[in-house]
Amino acid sequence: MDIIGQRGDPQIGNLATPVNSSRLSLAFIRNLPAYRRGLSANRRGLEVGMAHGYFLYGPFAILGPLRNTEYASTGGLLSAVAMISILTIALSLYASVEVGKPIETLTTPDVPEDLGTSVGWGEFANGFFIGGSGGVIFAYLLCQALYFDLIQKILG
């Protein structure tokens, strides 16, 4: 097994295991929006936000406190947008502090440069909010167009 040393110190390193160094896991991780080459910070945030907004809507709509009322879908929409807003504020706070260059590891040897600056993280946060809100609205509209009441009766 290979040991990837951190700053020349073998005590602080990353052990190459079959999980983190296999071609399948490397291909998967390198194709995630955070590590994909050629994307701007705004586009990275947009893709990550869309995924988060889309999957946050369902639990709030089906399992939220308004689950047995006619306002469950609207409550899920507003709750998920509020959660996306809170996450965007957290990303903006992270962008406001001194951000160092991300550490290169065995699975992510080519970390994008824009994730190492405050401006890049600010653009990521902006894209995250737009994408997250869009993902929530898309999930809401998708559930309104389909037979959401039938699904809710089956699950509830």
Curated annotation (Swiss-Prot):
It is a multi-pass membrane protein. This is Photosystem I reaction center subunit XI. It comes from Crocosphaera subtropica (strain ATCC 51142 / BH68) (Cyanothece sp. (strain ATCC 51142)). It comes from the Bacteria. One of its GO terms (biological process) is photosynthesis. Keywords: Membrane, Photosynthesis, Photosystem I, Thylakoid, Transmembrane, Transmembrane helix. Gene3D superfamilies: Photosystem I PsaL, reaction centre subunit XI. Signal peptide: none annotated. Disulfide bonds: none annotated. It is found in: Cellular thylakoid membrane. It holds the Pfam family PsaL. Belongs to the PsaL family. The chain crosses the membrane at residues 75-95, 128-148. InterPro entries: PSI_PsaL, PSI_PsaL_sf, PSI_suXI.
